């Protein structure tokens, strides 16, 4: 104990001594270092080397001894600097005051304090030790550097450096172990030898032995035992050589370290070089992007909308050839066009998205940017044109009613088209053809169409366009030159010549046909008999270039999509002035529909015309001369002239006083009836006199003259019209040259001489011009304090609108969107803006409404506003009344409340209203339920029967009902929440991409949320649908299959089947059609439990089964809800819960049929596409889109890409369809233009032509879009274009029928036997059924003499004398074979037994089967009936050798109808045989990304 205590007492004293020594050593180190740095003497040059070495060695030894002494100091003697300072300075710390702390906290505080102090002292010592070691190392390096400076380097040691692999190891070993001691020893030995003069005195014996001396030296200086006293210059260099040589010794640490250092060095250099290259490439790319920025058209501030660049990048990244889809995730396209980018921001933004692109991809991006810059220029041009047309609509809408008359608009377009020059007409589209006229206005015969494959819609377009561009450039050059040469008075003279009217146009003007264009030479020059100028000659020659006698001159409507009028052979101009010739046909040959430029007449008139074309009169206005026309029977009886054309027919002094061709004088019943309808089709049918349509004489002449100057002299158009229109109008060689030289061309910041204002409404221009009536009426209701209680309900109704932003097509009027789209389609994409300006001025002068029309328009506007207001108010009343969301009201309850209106004074009037409405059938409980629509109809009739102003009466009734319906705040909140959940079910169906899975999920979600929030229950639910029992018919004809259930019950319920002979009340619900509620299932005895493993004592709960009904009140399934999983003992369903569950069942039924209606439409489209692909070959792809509500609140709708059909006819159906947003389609906005206006859009994108056709709902709004991509082709051939129209007409009719059936508006029609099989299969054959019915109706309208003429045609051929075989006789023989084969094929359908009869080979005996019963049999024939047994292969053999072109050339309507009837019957028979494998529903699984389908069809032979 004493020893330990004494030792502990000695430790502080020893530590104090060590600290004192440490201070001394620190002071001495500093002094020695200071002296060493200052006491290094300069070595003289002539000083002896050995003495210098010895002095240096002595100094180094002394310094190293000092270092050794420092190493002996204990590390523990280092003292903290704070401790040293505390020995001199005393600091008094302030005391801490602690309030209300626990004892545990007080005890823990000192512990943390001493630990903290200990850690601080330890850290300070460690830092001091580390710093001391660093200082020592630095001092040692300084001493070595000094020694190197003092000692001269002996380069002889470098001779030891030899990397020879043979001696490398040995050399390294010697240099490292032996030579550092051996060399100084030899040197020392030689010095001694020299001192003792052993070599000089060789004969004198000496005791000095050099070997012994060397050995003694080596022993004394063994490096393992003796510290290195110092090194000479030779040794130091040898050491360096040793270190360098060790690097080359393999498998050593130095070698590996050196390799690592070398790799690191190389990687660093490579990284630096790569960084330099990256920076250089980035700068080069930025410079290229800055140069490319100048090719874009900019706003006045020199900026581009950011969304445009985002669209460009997205389109580039989505190119499948580049495989850059991952880059699209980084793009977040903005909704607004307000954010703009200047040149630097443009460069930085694009650079940030293309950092990892290769050089090849960057070059492709530059090309894409250049192309997009040109496309954006066209987009701005189209935007300027659309704004121009929108302002025109507002100008023509004098009453601000929001719509213009459709017939008047089309008539003005026809008038503008007829009086346009030939060159300008080549840029316009024909307003008498589709898509300007609707399918309902086209007869079936016309749709079978022109089969001439050699005729093209855009025949000769390139030539006309190039001539026009050449002329524009020539005129621009000549104008520029003439401006430099003309005198100051010359412009005035030119103006006088241009503006001088002609009182009497010369006769030679009248000789120019309208086909050549009513081009005029200067009137002053005509009167003086002067020749036209060179510029005018060039223009006139370009227009009349085909000559005075042309064949099939094409009237082209637009550079993109023109439905042309292919005219018949025309006589010369002089012959036309004297006598109008008609076409002389031989035999039954028929003139092409597209050549005639108008539609066919009725079937009876067509038949007579085909037989006597050559015998018709050749007077002006004859039917053969004008071309066949499409008109109804009443229109054929009496043709009335249009009042709009009267001024131009009466006046010869105006610019329209020229004689136009027969085609323009009689332009067909469609335009004639359309123009006549302007005079007679008012609301009340009152005629409109011509004085309201005609412009006063002087005013008419002035605007006609202005129009003439603008349209007939439109060769000059504008001074700065670009010489090249859109690049994809030229042939491939020209296109390549243009694209090659395009980057070299300077980019003007003007579009046809006009600067861009910076306004860009391509994505959201509806916000500026379009207003929707329901929103305006809702705002008016919000401002009316009488309906305060309904405001919140109406807001919910407006927010839950299905799809916003669409306009409905009604066939009577155009709203702004439709009007703008119509004019844009008429003008086309390539017409200069001056043409649009001319059309705008023409419309402003020509669109004149009578006072009666204006009043009718205002009445219609107010009526529409009243209907919208009425619908909103009545829907709000219905929802307030139906507070539980059941979806119906009791008629008895409604009547009881209505009869109290005005204290019962209007009771009799309300009873009269009930006589005009058909109420639904009473339910089993004698309860008549009114849906929302039926309730609105009932209240509308009540309002119409009450006395007073209709608007005031409506408001009074609504206010009475609103005040009579007292609802508590809790009921209102519950109603609002339930409405929201019900809306989510319907929204799930609309946004599901044609899938039922989201509908099931939202249905169960609504049930569970309501049970939890308003019933405090835990429920289970499942949906079972009725199916036909094919496997076990003895258990019943139908069964219930559980198709969906809540997640907890999936393993027990999903896909299970309930038969009629099993327990359960579900079939009772199906039979009775009313809900059944079982409060306590354990006591019922007829409940089937799916989970048989459950203990019988746990069967405690309620069960509710609800019927699922369609629009015809037919039951198709059961919705079951139970509370077996609820832990509460009392868990019965309350009345308000049952009513809400009925509402859920009702909304689910609507959503279910909504999805299936879209599914059936897809089947119809697939069938139509299959038929179209069998008869056409120019269509590259067909993409089908459906319209869905947008998930964003500020957007209107989105498009879902449902399926894509490739060039081979294989349809790829997407299970999870991609979503297309408007903001990402700036360069492909034609899809949204079509959906907005519900009109056909003809557009081009990326060098490909698109024909976009809407699929309309029964209301006229677009429910989908079909995008026909025809690739690089400018337009389809006439034959294929007619086939496209036929396909779309049938598809649209089938869609109307499907939608009407699902909504309950029309009753289902089962015409063919195959339609009774299944719903999906029925949708697949609906396309062919409609085509079959149309043909049967057309055949039924034929005259019996039409069939007899076929037999007489054969008889006349037989009675002809034998003549040599020439082309005419061969043609007649081919026609006879055609007639016989088609009639034999038809006979085989009804008399299949003749196949084995010898009479069938004799035509004379087969003739007897062509009798009066044949037409009846054809019109009543069902090719899908089970009793029909026909040899389809034999029938195909008879018609296989005859193409559609051959049938068309024959020109007999009977043969044509029968030919198509045979093909459709054959296709239906094949579908019937392939029923199970041919049509597969694409629903409802979403496990795969896509599936493929190809519908069976019957192709028509093409030759």
Curated annotation (Swiss-Prot):
Domain (EF-hand) ranges: 869-904
Region annotated Disordered, chain positions: 1-23, 477-518, 544-656, 730-750
Keywords carried by this UniProt record: Calcium, Metal-binding, Phosphoprotein
TM regions (residue ranges): none
InterPro entries assigned to the protein according to its UniProt record, in alphabetical order: EF_Hand_1_Ca_BS, EF_hand_dom, GAF-like_dom_sf
UniProt biased composition (Polar residues): 549-561
Residues reported to bind Ca(2+): 882, 884, 886, 893
Compositional bias annotation for Basic and acidic residues: 8-23, 562-582, 607-622
Organism this protein belongs to: Homo sapiens
Record-given protein name: EF-hand calcium-binding domain-containing protein 5
Superkingdom, natural source: Eukaryota
Molecular function, one GO term: calcium ion binding
Annotated positions of the Phosphoserine modification: 77
């Amino acid at each position: 104990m004493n020893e330990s205590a004494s030792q502990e007492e000695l430790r502080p004293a020893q530590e104090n001594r060590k600290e004192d020594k440490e201070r001394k050593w620190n002071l001495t180190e500093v002094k020695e270092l200071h002296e060493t740095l200052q006491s290094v003497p300069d070595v003289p040059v002539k000083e002896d080397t050995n003495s210098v070495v010895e002095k240096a060695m002595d100094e180094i030894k002394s310094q190293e001894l000092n270092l050794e002494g420092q190493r002996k100091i204990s590390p523990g003697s280092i003292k903290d600097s704070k401790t040293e300072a505390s020995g001199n300075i005393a600091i008094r710390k302030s005391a801490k005051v602690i309030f209300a702390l626990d004892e545990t906290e007080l005890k823990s505080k000192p512990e943390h304090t001493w630990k903290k102090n200990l850690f601080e002292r330890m850290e300070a010592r460690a830092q001091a030790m580390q710093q001391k070691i660093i200082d020592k190392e630095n001092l040692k390096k300084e001493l070595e550097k000094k020694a190197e400076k003092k000692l001269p380097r002996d380069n002889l040691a470098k001779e030891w450096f030899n990397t020879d692999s043979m001696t490398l190891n040995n050399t390294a070993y010697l240099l490292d172990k032996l030579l550092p001691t051996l060399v100084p020893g030899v040197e020392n030995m030689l010095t001694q030898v020299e001192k003792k003069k052993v070599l000089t005195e060789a004969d004198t014996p000496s005791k000095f032995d050099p070997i012994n001396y060397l050995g003694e030296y080596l022993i004394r200086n063994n490096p393992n035992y003796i510290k290195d006293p110092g090194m000479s210059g030779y040794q130091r260099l040898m050491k360096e050589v040793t270190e360098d040589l060790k690097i080359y010794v393999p498998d050593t640490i130095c070698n590996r370290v050196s390799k690592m250092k070398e790799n690191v060095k190389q990687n660093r250099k490579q990284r630096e070089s790569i960084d330099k290259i990256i920076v250089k490439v980035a700068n080069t790319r930025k410079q290229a992007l800055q140069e490319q920025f100048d090719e874009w058209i900019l706003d006045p501030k020199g900026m581009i909308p950011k969304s445009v660049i985002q669209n460009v990048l997205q389109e580039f990244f989505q190119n499948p050839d580049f495989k850059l889809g991952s880059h699209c995730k980084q793009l977040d396209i903005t909704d607004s066009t307000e954010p703009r980018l200047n040149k630097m921001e443009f460069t930085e933004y694009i650079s940030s998205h293309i950092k990892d692109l290769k050089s090849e991809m960057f070059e492709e991006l530059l090309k894409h940017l250049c192309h997009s810059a040109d496309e954006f220029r066209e987009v701005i041009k189209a935007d300027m044109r659309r704004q121009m047309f929108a302002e025109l609509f507002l100008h023509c809408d004098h009453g601000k009613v929001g719509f213009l008359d459709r017939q008047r608009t089309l008539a003005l377009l026809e008038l503008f088209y007829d009086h346009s020059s030939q060159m300008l007409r080549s840029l316009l589209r024909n307003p008498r053809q589709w898509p300007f006229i609707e399918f309902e206005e086209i007869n079936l015969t016309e749709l079978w169409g022109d089969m001439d494959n050699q005729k093209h819609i855009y025949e000769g377009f390139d030539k006309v366009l190039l001539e026009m561009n050449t002329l524009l450039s020539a005129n621009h050059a000549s104008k520029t030159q003439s401006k430099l040469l003309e005198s100051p008075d010359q412009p005035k003279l030119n103006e006088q010549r241009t503006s001088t009217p002609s009182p009497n146009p010369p006769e030679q003007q009248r000789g120019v046909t309208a086909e050549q264009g009513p081009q005029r030479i200067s009137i002053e020059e005509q009167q003086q008999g002067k020749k036209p100028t060179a510029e005018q000659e060039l223009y006139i020659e370009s227009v009349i270039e085909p000559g005075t006698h042309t064949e099939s001159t094409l009237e082209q409507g637009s550079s993109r999509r023109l439905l042309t009028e292919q005219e018949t052979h025309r006589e010369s101009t002089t012959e036309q002035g004297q006598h109008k010739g008609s076409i002389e046909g031989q035999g039954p040959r028929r003139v092409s529909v597209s050549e005639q430029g108008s539609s066919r007449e009725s079937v009876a008139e067509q038949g007579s015309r085909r037989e006597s074309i050559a015998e018709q009169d050749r007077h002006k206005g004859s039917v053969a001369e004008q071309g066949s026309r499409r008109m109804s029977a009443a229109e054929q009886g009496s043709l009335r002239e249009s009042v709009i054309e009267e001024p131009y027919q009466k006046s010869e002094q105006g610019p329209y006083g020229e004689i136009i061709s027969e085609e323009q004088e009689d332009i067909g019943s469609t335009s004639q009836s359309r123009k006549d309808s302007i005079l007679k089709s008012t609301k009340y049918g009152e005629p409109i006199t011509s004085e309201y349509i005609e412009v006063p004489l002087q005013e008419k002449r002035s605007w006609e003259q202005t129009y003439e100057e603008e349209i007939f002299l439109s060769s000059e158009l504008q001074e700065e019209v670009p010489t090249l229109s859109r690049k994809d109008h030229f042939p491939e060689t020209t296109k390549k040259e243009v694209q090659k030289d395009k980057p070299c061309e300077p980019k003007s910041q003007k579009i046809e001489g006009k600067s861009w204002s910076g306004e860009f409404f391509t994505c959201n221009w509806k916000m500026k011009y379009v207003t929707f009536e329901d929103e305006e009426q809702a705002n008016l209701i919000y401002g009316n304090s009488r309906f305060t209680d309904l405001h919140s309900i109406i807001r919910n109704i407006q927010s839950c609108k299905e799809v916003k932003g669409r306009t409905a097509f009604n066939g009577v009027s155009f709203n702004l969107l439709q009007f703008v789209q119509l004019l844009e389609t008429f003008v086309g994409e390539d017409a200069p803006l001056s043409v649009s300006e001319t059309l705008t001025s023409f419309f402003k002068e020509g669109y004149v409404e009578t006072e009666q029309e204006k009043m009718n328009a205002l009445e219609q506007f107010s009526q529409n506003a009243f209907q919208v207001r009425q619908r909103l108010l009545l829907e709000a009343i219905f929802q307030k009344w139906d507070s539980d969301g059941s979806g119906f009201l009791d008629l008895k309850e409604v009547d009881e409340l209505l009869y109290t209106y005005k204290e019962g004074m209007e009771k009799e009037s309300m009873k009269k209203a009930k006589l005009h409405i058909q109420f639904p059938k009473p339910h089993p409980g004698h309860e008549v339920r009114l849906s929302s629509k039926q309730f609105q109809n009932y209240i509308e009739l009540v309002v119409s029967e009450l006395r007073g102003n209709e608007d005031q009466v409506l408001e009074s009734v609504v206010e009475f009902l609103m005040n009579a319906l007292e609802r508590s705040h809790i009921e209102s909140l519950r109603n609002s929440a339930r409405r929201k959940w019900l809306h989510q079910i319907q929204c799930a169906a609309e946004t599901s991409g044609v899938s039922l899975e989201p509908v099931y999920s939202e249905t169960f979600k609504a049930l569970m949320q309501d049970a939890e929030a308003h019933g405090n229950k835990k429920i289970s639910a499942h949906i079972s649908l009725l199916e036909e029992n094919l496997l076990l018919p003895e258990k019943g004809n139908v069964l219930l299959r559980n198709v969906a259930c809540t997640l907890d019950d999936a393993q027990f319920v999903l896909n299970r089947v309930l038969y009629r002979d099993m327990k359960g009340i579900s079939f009772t619900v199906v039979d009775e059609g009313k809900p059944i509620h079982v409060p306590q299932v354990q006591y019922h005895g007829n409940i089937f439990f799916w989970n048989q493993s459950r203990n019988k004592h746990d069967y405690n709960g309620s069960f509710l089964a609800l019927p699922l009904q369609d629009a015809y009140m037919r039951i198709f399934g059961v919705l079951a809800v139970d509370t077996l999983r609820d832990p509460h003992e009392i868990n019965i369903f309350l009345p308000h819960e049952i009513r809400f569950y009925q509402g859920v069942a009702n909304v689910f039924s609507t959503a279910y049929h909504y999805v299936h209606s879209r599914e059936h439409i897809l089947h119809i489209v697939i069938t139509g596409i299959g038929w179209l692909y069998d008869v056409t070959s120019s269509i590259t792809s067909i993409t089908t889109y459906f319209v869905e509500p947008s998930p964003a609140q500020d957007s209107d709708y989105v498009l879902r890409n449902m399926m894509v059909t490739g060039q081979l006819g294989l349809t790829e159906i997407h299970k999870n369809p991609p979503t297309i947003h408007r903001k990402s389609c700036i360069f492909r906005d034609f899809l949204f233009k079509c959906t907005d206006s519900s009109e056909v859009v003809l557009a081009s994108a990326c060098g490909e032509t698109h024909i976009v056709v809407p699929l309309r709902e029964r209301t006229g709004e677009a429910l989908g879009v079909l995008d026909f991509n025809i690739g690089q082709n400018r337009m389809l051939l006439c034959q294929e274009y007619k086939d496209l129209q036929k396909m779309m007409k049938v598809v649209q009719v089938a869609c109307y029928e499907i939608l009407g059936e699902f909504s309950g508006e029309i009753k289902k029609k089962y015409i063919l036997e195959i339609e009774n099989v299944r719903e999906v299969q029925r949708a697949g054959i609906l396309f062919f059924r409609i085509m079959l019915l149309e043909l049967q109706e057309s055949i039924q309208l034929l005259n019996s003499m039409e069939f007899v003429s076929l037999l007489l045609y054969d008889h006349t051929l037989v009675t002809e004398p034998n003549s040599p075989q020439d082309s005419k006789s061969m043609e007649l023989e081919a026609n006879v074979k055609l007639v016989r084969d088609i009639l034999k094929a038809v006979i085989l359908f009804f008399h299949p037994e003749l196949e084995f009869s010898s009479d069938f080979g004799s035509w004379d005996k087969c003739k007897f089967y062509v009798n009066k019963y044949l037409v009846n049999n054809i019109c009543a024939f069902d090719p899908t009936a089970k009793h029909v047994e026909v040899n389809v292969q034999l029938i195909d053999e008879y018609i296989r050798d005859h193409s559609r072109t051959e049938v068309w050339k024959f020109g007999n309507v009977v043969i044509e109808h029968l030919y198509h009837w045979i093909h459709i019957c054959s296709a239906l028979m094949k579908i019937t045989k392939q029923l199970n494998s041919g049509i597969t529903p694409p629903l409802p699984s979403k496990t795969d990304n896509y599936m493929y389908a190809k519908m069976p069809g019957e192709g028509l032979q093409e030759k």
